[in-house]
Design a protein with these regions (language model features):
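Intrinsically disordered or highly flexible coil/loop and linker segments, enriched in small
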Residues: 8-15, 83
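A generic, well-ordered mixed alpha/beta core segment in the N-terminal half of proteins
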Residues: 1-6
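A broad, structure-centric signal for solvent-exposed, well-ordered loop/edge residues
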Residues: 25-26, 96, 150
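Extended, solvent-exposed, turn-rich assembly/linker loops in the middle of proteins
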Residues: 29-120
Length: 242
């Protein structure tokens, strides 16, 4: 029997909150039998500034001008939302939306300097792209590539594609935790080992095998969610891949 460790479950929730502005916690047993469609225990939504551009906002004269669109949009948002420290996205989104922009190679060769050869061969890294972005006043890029095997046994991509989230600072927020009930009233015969964030780990066995159980009462607190901007780029991505 395998139970999803608390920190892995929280990785899924925090990733969903950052990229979608919402996350759902399901009952473990019901999730296995229903494919995570029933018995929602908790739904969290955050008041992000959501923006969903259409193809006409980005495509100009048949060219993908996403970088220019992003610059202009962030400039208009600055008086109300401030200057963003970084933008997070998946590798697929980076390749499709940033490197796939027509203007990346056409307009920013001067900034690339000695790295221009990397552009011509398609070997542009996220760190190199970040140099270009910070050089033109955009936030630096942070690529997110993480997977977790959920309680149904399926690998889950933590961070959603076709989304870009802009964060005011590197400090995303805090993980609030509470003393688990088992800490004061343990199950008879069980031994609990305390871990970070007041998490309890219990190892035991019976005639059917060995078990490891995690007990934690956590909830993420995202700092200043009303100042976070999230771009939903699904319409643009679908047009590009068509």
């Amino acid at each position: 029997q395998i139970t999803l460790a608390a920190h892995k479950r929280m990785d899924i929730i925090v990733g969903a909150l950052l990229m979608l502005g919402e996350a759902t916690v399901y009952n473990k047993d019901a999730a296995i039998t229903s494919g995570q469609t029933n018995n929602k225990l908790l739904e969290i939504t955050l008041p992000f500034n959501f923006i969903k551009p259409k193809s006409g906002d980005v495509v100009v004269d048949g060219k993908n001008m996403f970088i220019s669109y992003l610059r202009e949009k962030l400039h208009s948002l600055a008086p109300d939302y401030g200057v963003y420290a970084k933008m997070i996205m998946t590798r697929a989104s980076f390749n499709k939306l940033i490197l796939g922009s027509s203007e990346f190679g056409e307009q920013y060769k001067m900034i690339l300097g000695s790295n221009e050869m990397k552009l011509s061969t398609g070997l542009v890294s996220s760190s190199l792209a970040s140099e270009v972005f910070t050089g033109i006043g955009l936030p630096r890029i942070e690529i997110k590539e993480d997977y977790v095997k959920d309680q149904t046994g399926k690998n889950v991509q933590i961070y959603a594609d076709n989304r870009i989230t802009l964060l005011p600072s590197d400090q995303i927020g805090y993980m609030r935790h509470h003393t688990p009930y088992e800490a004061t009233d343990p199950v008879q015969g069980r031994t609990y080992i305390p871990s970070e964030g007041q998490m309890l780990i219990s190892n035991y066995r019976d005639k059917n095998g060995r078990y490891m159980e995690y007990t934690a009462e956590w909830i993420p607190q995202i700092s200043n969610p009303d100042l976070i901007t999230n771009f939903d780029l699904s319409e643009i991505a679908s047009i590009q891949s068509a």
